[in-house]
């Protein structure tokens, strides 16, 4: 992996964001996702690499493009594994709400955990708390540790939690400690990454979300030096989701075992979910969000705001790109 490849990976998420943003606010979440998928796959196909989707839009029989195991790129060059979410926060995009973005994680072949389409209990925190907070602790314990690490009182801390019924007790505990809760409807990747940057007002992410997005978050947090832990959730009684209405705990355990996951209660650290020597996160805003703006359409150009985090050179680059239209007469600053 090199800087040229990283630049092309940036362009992959930019093109996906632009395609999806054309449908922002139209209430068409499936169409917005499909547009992002097609644009992402098209741009990936132009890269000199032996790419492979390890986390994507589903199994081969469930998704026509960017399915798990699909080969992308020219077929020549370095081997690269991808975990992709072309339109993270499809509902946010469809309703023109904050926080939707096109995201991916990339690493050398074999460098990303092939997360099953399960749920994952997650804990993300700033670099100062790395290895000190622990997902095994109660929220109360972690807030006390986080307070000490950051030099803030607990009532100055903000914790992001997915707004789900399953988090009722977690939210009650956090508020009972005096910390602030910021509920989000979708899109916990951006919230996790925000924990890695001072000044965002986000100090911690707690709770259960999708496992594939957990791998993408872990890649970003590993590159940032932040704290991230994840533990797969296989009990429908804990997940409390209609998607698992016909699933059983025993059936889910069997599914995990069939995937080669025998230590079903393992707690994964960031460097286990994203274990490659070179790890890259790339995200581009579809709608405005905490870390960057969404796509802006102007008469003579389209503007994108993106973030690339890389272990290759230990950088986090915020990039504003002006995509100039044919025949443009005037480009404003």
UniProtKB/Swiss-Prot annotation:
Tell me which Gene Ontology terms the entry assigns under biological process. fructose 1,6-bisphosphate metabolic process; gluconeogenesis; glycerol metabolic process; reductive pentose-phosphate cycle
This enzyme catalyses: beta-D-fructose 1,6-bisphosphate + H2O = beta-D-fructose 6-phosphate + phosphate; D-sedoheptulose 1,7-bisphosphate + H2O = D-sedoheptulose 7-phosphate + phosphate
User: Per the UniProt record, which EC number(s) apply here?
Assistant: 3.1.3.11, 3.1.3.37
Keywords attached to this Swiss-Prot or TrEMBL record, sorted alphabetically, are:
Calvin cycle, Carbohydrate metabolism, Hydrolase, Manganese, Metal-binding
Q: Which residues bind Mn(2+) 2?
A: 85, 88, 213
Residues binding substrate, per UniProt:
88-90, 119, 164-166, 186-188
* Cofactor annotation: Mn(2+)
Query: What InterPro entries does the record point to?
Result: FBPase_class-2/SBPase (IPR004464)
- What pathway is this protein said to act in by its record? Carbohydrate biosynthesis; Calvin cycle
Q: Which residues bind Mn(2+) 1?
A: 33, 57
For this UniProt entry, the molecular function terms from Gene Ontology, in alphabetical order, are:
fructose 1,6-bisphosphate 1-phosphatase activity; metal ion binding; sedoheptulose-bisphosphatase activity
Q: Does the keyword Metal-binding apply?
A: yes
- A cellular component term, taken from the record's GO annotations: cytosol
Transmembrane intervals: none
Which family is it part of?
Answer: Belongs to the FBPase class 2 family.
UniProt function note: Catalyzes the hydrolysis of fructose 1,6-bisphosphate (Fru 1,6-P2) and sedoheptulose 1,7-bisphosphate (Sed 1,7-P2) to fructose 6-phosphate and sedoheptulose 7-phosphate, respectively.
| NCBIfam families per UniProt | glpX
* Subunit structure of this chain's protein: Homotetramer.
Protein name as catalogued: D-fructose 1,6-bisphosphatase class 2/sedoheptulose 1,7-bisphosphatase
- What organism does this protein naturally occur in? Prochlorococcus marinus (strain MIT 9301)
**What high-level taxonomic lineage is stated for the organism?**
Bacteria, Bacillati, Cyanobacteriota, Cyanophyceae, Synechococcales
């Amino acid at each position: 992996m090199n800087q040229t490849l990283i630049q092309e990976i940036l362009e992959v998420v930019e093109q996906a964001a632009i395609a999806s943003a054309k449908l922002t606010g139209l209430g068409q979440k499936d169409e917005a996702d499909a547009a992002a998928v097609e644009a992402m796959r098209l741009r990936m196909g132009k890269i000199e690499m032996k790419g492979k989707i390890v986390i994507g839009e589903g199994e081969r029989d469930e998704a026509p493009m960017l399915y798990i195991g699909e080969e992308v790129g020219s077929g020549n060059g370095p081997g690269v594994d991808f975990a992709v979410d072309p339109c993270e926060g499809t509902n946010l995009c469809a309703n023109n709400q904050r926080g939707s973005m096109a995201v991916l994680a990339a690493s050398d072949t074999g460098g990303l955990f092939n997360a099953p389409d399960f749920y994952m209990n997650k804990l993300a925190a700033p670099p100062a708390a790395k290895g000190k907070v622990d997902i095994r602790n109660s929220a109360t314990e972690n807030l006390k540790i986080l307070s000490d690490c950051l030099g803030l009182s607990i009532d100055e801390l903000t914790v992001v939690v997915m707004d789900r019924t399953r988090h009722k007790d977690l939210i009650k505990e956090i508020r009972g400690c005096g910390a602030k809760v910021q509920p989000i409807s979708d899109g916990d990747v951006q919230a996790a990454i925000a924990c890695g940057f001072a000044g965002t007002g986000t100090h911690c992410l707690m709770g259960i979300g999708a496992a594939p997005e957990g791998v993408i978050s872990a890649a970003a947090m590993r590159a940032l030096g932040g704290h991230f832990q994840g533990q797969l959730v296989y009990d429908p009684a804990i997940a409390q989701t209609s998607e698992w209405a016909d699933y059983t705990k025993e059936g889910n355990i069997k599914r995990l075992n069939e995937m080669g996951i025998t230590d079903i209660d393992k707690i994964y650290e960031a460097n286990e979910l994203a274990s490659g020597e070179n790890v890259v996160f790339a995200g581009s805003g579809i709608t405005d969000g905490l870390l960057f703006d969404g796509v802006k359409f102007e008469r003579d150009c389209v503007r994108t705001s993106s973030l690339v985090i890389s272990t290759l050179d230990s950088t986090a680059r915020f990039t504003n790109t002006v995509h100039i239209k044919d025949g443009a007469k005037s480009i404003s600053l």
